[in-house]
């Protein structure tokens, strides 16, 4: 893999590949798995700790030695051992159940899964007797020319009689070529003991291919994604171009959700009935309600209630909560803020550490200046507030219900309910009603003097 990350922790559709193997093992056996790790892969032990027991293989000396380490960690009452590879994430529980059943029916010492491979190059061949029973497994480098013509290969999945395995694991001998102990040599030992080795031959559908490099990882993820997308479409989700839709297994989608091309949904994202996710959207750990529209936007760890429109080019950062029927438009950013119902933030503004009441309008260019260089401060905006374009709200600050700000206002102190804030810094004024008489025009101020209304900057 050419990576500092242990191979089995590389992700497929949002989960480390070993998680899928553990899922299959638990579903097939109903027991807690045991994972063998080495000192170089201690991250594997940490990752699986909640779901599996672990055993340390001090010095990696091959698959047979790994199985020995596992046996040392198992109790004596274990009567059957199912051996899986952590790098075969597409393995299915029903296949493992069939493997266990095959051993039980034949009273075999070992049952194994083999595959008729289209290209067996580099893989261990399954050699059978004239009667069709498994005689031995020969590695590619040790195979004769005739044996290399065999297309039946060992898939590396085994069910083994526990009592027999304990007696014979010590009989494994190091390979002359590598010095390693091969698990596959157990097949020959079983035949020496006159025990049957059952082979379960399956078609090569790609599910049992081990992952050893990034190319194989990408192919496995593609196969998994095709299956996942097909499952959601059969459940009532529309995908206009499934080949460009990327979903992780933890995502939940309701009926009549529509996903346009080039959509990425990750983590614990949820989309409610009738919601449409537009092309180019990237959504992570976000709950979206019903009948929403998201257009070419990024949403992270946020909550979006019903009938909300987001985008294009909006960014909801962690902690954003957008109320029903609200509208968040182009180049609008929200972080750790709660918007009430029917809030309009249509263009080019930033709301951080803020709380907005229902029916508030956020003018273009509005910014909550929430950071003083040391701490974040909160902005509270009431119901029915109208924020003029280019309003700067220096937190901490509160704007009461029904208040307004003029264009370019820099609000540095609280604005009472129903009042108007004008200027830089803003001064508080009464809101003039449409039927009020206009105020007399002020005389122009001298250069360098305050405006005619006594406020700094433009009057």
Region locations from a protein language model:
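Conserved N-terminal catalytic core of the sugar/cofactor nucleotidyltransferase
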Residues: 11, 15-101
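Residue-level signal for inorganic ion chemistry
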Residues: 18, 70, 87, 99, ...
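Catalytic cores of nucleotide-enabled group-transfer and carboxylate-activating enzymes in metabolic
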Residues: 22, 30-32, 47, 71-72, ...
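Structural beta-sheet core signal
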Residues: 35, 82-83, 110-113, 199
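Conserved core of the sugar-phosphate nucleotidyltransferase
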Residues: 42, 50, 91-177, 184-186, ...
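Conserved alpha/beta core of the MobA/IspD/sugar-nucleotide pyrophosphorylase nucleotidyltransferase superfamily
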Residues: 151-254
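Acidic, glycine-rich loop-and-beta core segments that form the ion-binding/anion-interacting portion
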Residues: 245-247, 251-320
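Glycine-rich hexapeptide-repeat left-handed beta-helix
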Residues: 294-459
């Amino acid at each position: 893999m050419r990576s500092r990350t242990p191979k089995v922790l590389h992700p497929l559709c949002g989960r480390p590949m070993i998680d899928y193997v553990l899922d299959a093992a638990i579903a097939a056996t109903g027991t807690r798995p045991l994972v063998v790790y080495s000192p170089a892969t201690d991250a594997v032990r940490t990752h699986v700790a909640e779901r599996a027991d672990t055993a340390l293989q001090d010095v990696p000396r091959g698959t047979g030695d790994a199985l020995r380490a596992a046996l040392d960690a198992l109790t004596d009452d274990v009567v059957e051992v199912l051996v899986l590879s952590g790098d075969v994430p597409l393995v299915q529980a029903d296949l493992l159940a069939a493997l266990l059943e095959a051993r039980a029916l034949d009273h075999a010492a070992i049952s194994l899964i083999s595959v008729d491979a289209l290209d067996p190059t580099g893989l261990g061949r399954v050699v059978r007797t004239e009667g069709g029973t498994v005689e031995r497994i020969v590695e590619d480098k040790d195979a004769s020319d005739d044996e290399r013509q065999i297309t039946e290969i060992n898939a590396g999945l085994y069910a083994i009689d526990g009592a027999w395995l304990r007696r014979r694991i010590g009989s494994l001998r190091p390979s002359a070529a590598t010095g390693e102990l091969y698990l596959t040599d157990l097949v020959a030992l079983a035949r020496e003991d006159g025990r049957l080795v059952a082979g379960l031959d399956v078609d090569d559908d790609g599910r049992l291919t081990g992952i050893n490099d990034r190319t194989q990882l990408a192919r496995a993820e593609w196969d998994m994604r095709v299956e996942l997308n097909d499952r959601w479409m059969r459940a009532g989700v529309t995908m206009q171009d499934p080949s460009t839709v990327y979903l992780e297994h933890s995502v939940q989608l309701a009926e009549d959700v529509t996903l346009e091309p080039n959509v990425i949904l990750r983590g614990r994202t949820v989309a409610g009935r009738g919601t449409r996710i537009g092309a180019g959207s990237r959504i992570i750990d976000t709950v979206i309600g019903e009948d929403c529209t998201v257009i070419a936007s990024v949403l992270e760890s946020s909550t979006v209630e019903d009938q909300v429109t987001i985008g294009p080019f909006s960014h909801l950062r962690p902690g954003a909560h957008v109320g029903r029927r609200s509208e968040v438009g182009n180049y609008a950013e929200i972080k750790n803020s709660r918007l009430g119902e029917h809030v309009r933030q249509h263009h080019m503004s930033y709301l951080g550490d803020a709380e907005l009441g229902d029916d508030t309008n956020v003018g273009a260019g509005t910014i909550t200046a929430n950071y003083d260089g040391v701490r974040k401060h909160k902005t509270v905006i009431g119901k029915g507030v109208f924020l003029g374009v280019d309003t700067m709200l220096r937190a901490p600050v509160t704007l009461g219900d029904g208040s307004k700000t003029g264009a370019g206002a820099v609000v540095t102190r609280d604005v009472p309910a129903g009042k108007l804030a004008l200027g830089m810094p803003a001064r508080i004024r009464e809101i003039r009603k449409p039927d009020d008489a206009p105020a007399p025009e002020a005389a122009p101020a001298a250069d360098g003097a305050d405006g005619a209304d006594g406020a700094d900057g433009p009057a």
